[in-house]
């Protein structure tokens, strides 16, 4: 039976239709927020997937171009692969949902959010997030919901709940928070150096709004929810763990994992696995899950070491950062490069500068964003973790890590007017043992400074982890988690920022939420750590941006012209501007406001191009001096081209102070001559004189 539910949310109406569409899905809802419409569905397989030791959850966020009245580009005129925004939104939805499914659930689950219309006042990402949580909670799929999500913007210091697309894009804060009834379960933020106290305030304002959404969901689930279905547990049998502990004691496992060298630890675990496989040779059902069982045994051992003994696997103190190193100019000839090393995590970042014509073009649902000037890309090759694998391009993880490090630096980048370049930073993972995205932030910051990009402040990033006990008060926050602590811990809380404030946050967890004291402690720990990284490591490699771009980087000169004269510079079908480019070997960009950027590597050629543009756009007042080329000779005079596409005439009587009978007696085609402007005639044509040029010219 079709039912409709509504609530007021941040000054707009949120409407949920249940039973109207997609009856064959486990859960479905057509959701409208303002006039933004998203179809959210969830489907689970009947049986668990064989041979997997993880929960196979897939989250999709489909951006349909008809939602904004567009026909997709390309030959087929249909949507292709997911955009970067769609991938990032899918990841943000996945992170709070995944911890709320049973840990021993192995059925395939697909969450799909299809954007069908977009109201610029109501962002579709918010609707998809709410829809995913709602349809899963009301479905028959095992899920410990509900959870809810809210976005927060900030303009002039004032918070704005679920801001419009325009406010979200231009404001000082882009914060997304997911909550359960009592705890925060996910945080994603980009910020313009916001102080830690202000960020915490914003997080818990979102949390409060989430409680009203959860109450709304409770009403819907009470009327339309389905009983949860039974499922086959894939948990490791208790008797198997007992048998393992007789062969490999907890002390043996602790000794195996207690080393600061990742490769040694992995070798120790392989030996333990081989020993257990030999002992369980006659138990096929145990051999099938032995890898997962050893993983769980490691996990219990590491968590006990940290929580009860305050002993980390590599011997560090709870708040201690791994050994750090930083250097710049590692790679010759590139525009800027830097390498940042933290323990066994190592990132090399390379920056490339280009004219603004090379900005990334974006054709998405947000009409306010059509280009991206700063691009950060992250690569994670198999060799960085000692594996063999063919590279098949960036996956969702690589795109997500690249976007986080990009978000971290956006707040400190110079404006286009201050620095008229497109900027690409590429982080190459040389070695990985946790927090490569935070190392990418540090490396890209240094590479930008080495490239001569005048960033406003230095930015660093660090991640905190968490191990929890049986109660909310029983926990330990870890500074700078390595890979093992990430895998076996409960939290990965990444924060980037300057000395002034936070520029980005990404928090994802494996438990059912964090209390406020944990959130506050994690943010305080990351602040202390990033100050140390900037002051004691990064600033000793490079303390401020270089005053000029590198020798191999293109140079850019900017001038302003009258917008009404842009057509004169461009010429008919681009003839004039193309001739300037051909003569001087430069690139020229002109905005609608008349800002002209000339880009090249030869300063003399660039100056020549600037002179041509200035000449073309001059008002040709009487007395101006020009140098030009004779391009045509007539009986009555000669035509002088003084700039591409610009000609004036010297009458025969104005060629020489002495009387001449023929123009050819003095001038030939191709001659370079200096002329003085006499003004324009009634037809608007420019008149020149050679004989009246002042002697000092």
Question: Model-flagged regions — what are they?
Answer:
Residues 103-109, 144-146, 213-231, 263, ...:
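Flexible, glycine/charged-enriched surface loops at secondary-structure junctions
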Residues 1-45, 49, 53, 230-369, ...:
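Extended amphipathic alpha-helical scaffolds
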Residues 1-232:
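Long, basic N-terminal domains or extensions that often function
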Residues 27-29, 122-141, 328-351, 433-453, ...:
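Conserved phosphate/anionic-ligand binding catalytic regions in large, soluble enzymes, centered on
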Residues 25-109, 115-117, 122, 188, ...:
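Glycine-rich, flexible beta-strand/loop modules in the N-terminal catalytic cores of phosphate-handling
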Residues 140-260, 448-547:
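Mobile "lid/hinge" segments at catalytic clefts and subdomain interfaces of large enzymes
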Residues 33, 42-44, 61-63, 113-117, ...:
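Flexible glycine-/small-residue-rich
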Residues 290, 552-556, 563-697:
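Single-stranded RNA-binding regions, centering on S1/OB-family and related RNA-binding modules
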């Amino acid at each position: 039976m079709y039912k409709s539910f509504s609530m007021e949310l941040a000054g707009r109406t949120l409407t949920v239709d249940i039973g109207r569409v997609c009856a064959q899905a486990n859960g479905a809802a057509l959701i409208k927020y303002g006039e933004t419409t998203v179809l959210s569905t969830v489907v689970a397989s009947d049986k668990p997937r064989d041979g997997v030791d993880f929960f196979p959850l897939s989250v999709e966020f489909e951006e349909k171009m008809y939602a904004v009245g567009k026909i997709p580009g390309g030959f087929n005129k249909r949507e292709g692969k997911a955009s970067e925004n769609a991938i990032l939104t899918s990841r943000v939805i996945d992170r709070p949902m995944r911890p709320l499914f049973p840990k021993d659930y192995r059925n395939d689950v697909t969450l799909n959010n299809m954007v069908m219309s977009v109201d610029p006042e109501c962002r579709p990402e918010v609707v998809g997030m709410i829809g995913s949580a709602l349809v899963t909670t009301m479905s028959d799929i095992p899920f410990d919901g509900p959870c809810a999500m809210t976005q927060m913007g900030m303009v002039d210091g004032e918070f704005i709940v679920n801001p419009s697309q325009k406010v979200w894009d231009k404001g000082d804060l882009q914060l997304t928070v997911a909550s359960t009834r009592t705890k925060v379960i996910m945080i994603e933020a980009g910020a313009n150096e916001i102080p830690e106290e202000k960020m915490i305030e914003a997080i818990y304002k979102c949390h409060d709004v989430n409680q009203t959404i959860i109450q709304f969901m409770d009403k819907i689930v009470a009327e339309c929810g389905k009983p949860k279905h039974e499922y086959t547990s894939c948990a490791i049998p208790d008797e198997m763990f007992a048998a393992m502990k007789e062969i490999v004691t907890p002390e043996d496992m602790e000794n195996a994992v207690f080393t600061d060298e990742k490769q040694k630890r992995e070798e120790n675990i392989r030996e333990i696995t081989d020993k257990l496989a030999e002992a369980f040779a006659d138990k096929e059902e145990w051999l099938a899950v032995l890898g997962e069982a050893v993983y769980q045994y490691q996990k219990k051992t590491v968590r006990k070491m940290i929580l009860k003994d305050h002993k980390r696997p590599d011997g560090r103190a709870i708040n201690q950062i791994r050994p750090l190193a930083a250097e710049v100019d590692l790679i010759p000839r590139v525009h800027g490069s830097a390498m940042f090393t933290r323990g066994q995590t190592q990132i090399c970042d390379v920056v490339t500068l280009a004219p603004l014509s090379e900005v990334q073009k974006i054709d998405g649902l947000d009409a306010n964003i059509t280009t991206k000037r700063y691009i950060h890309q992250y690569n994670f090759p198999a060799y960085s973790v000692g594996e063999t694998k063919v590279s098949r391009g960036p996956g969702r993880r690589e795109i997500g890590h690249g976007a986080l490090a990009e978000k971290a630096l956006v707040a400190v980048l110079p404006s286009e007017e201050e620095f008229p370049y497109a900027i690409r930073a590429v982080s190459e993972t040389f070695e990985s043992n946790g927090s490569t995205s935070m190392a990418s932030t540090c490396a890209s910051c240094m590479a930008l400074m080495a490239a001569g990009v005048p960033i406003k402040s230095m930015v660093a990033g660090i991640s905190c982890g968490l191990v929890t006990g049986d109660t909310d008060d029983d926990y330990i926050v870890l500074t700078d988690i390595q890979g093992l602590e990430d895998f076996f811990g409960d939290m990965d809380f990444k924060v980037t920022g300057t000395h002034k404030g936070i520029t980005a946050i990404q928090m994802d967890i494996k438990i059912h939420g964090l209390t406020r004291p944990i959130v506050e402690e994690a943010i305080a720990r990351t602040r202390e750590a990033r100050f140390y990284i900037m002051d004691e490591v990064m600033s000793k490699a490079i303390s401020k941006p270089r005053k000029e771009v590198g020798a191999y980087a293109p140079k850019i000169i900017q001038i302003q012209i009258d917008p009404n004269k842009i057509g004169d510079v461009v010429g008919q079908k681009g003839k004039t501007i193309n001739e300037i480019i051909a003569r001087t070997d430069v690139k020229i960009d002109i905005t609608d406001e008349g800002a002209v950027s000339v880009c090249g590597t030869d300063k003399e050629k660039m100056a020549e191009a600037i002179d041509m543009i200035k000449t073309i756009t001059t008002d040709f007042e009487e007395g101006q001096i020009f140098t030009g080329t004779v391009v045509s000779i007539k009986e009555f005079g000669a035509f002088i081209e003084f700039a591409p596409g610009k000609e004036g005439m010297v009458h025969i009587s104005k060629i020489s102070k002495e009387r001449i009978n023929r123009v050819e007696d003095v001038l030939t085609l191709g001659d370079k001559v200096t002329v003085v402007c006499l003004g324009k005639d009634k037809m608007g044509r420019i008149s020149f004189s050679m004989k009246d040029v002042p002697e000092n010219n």
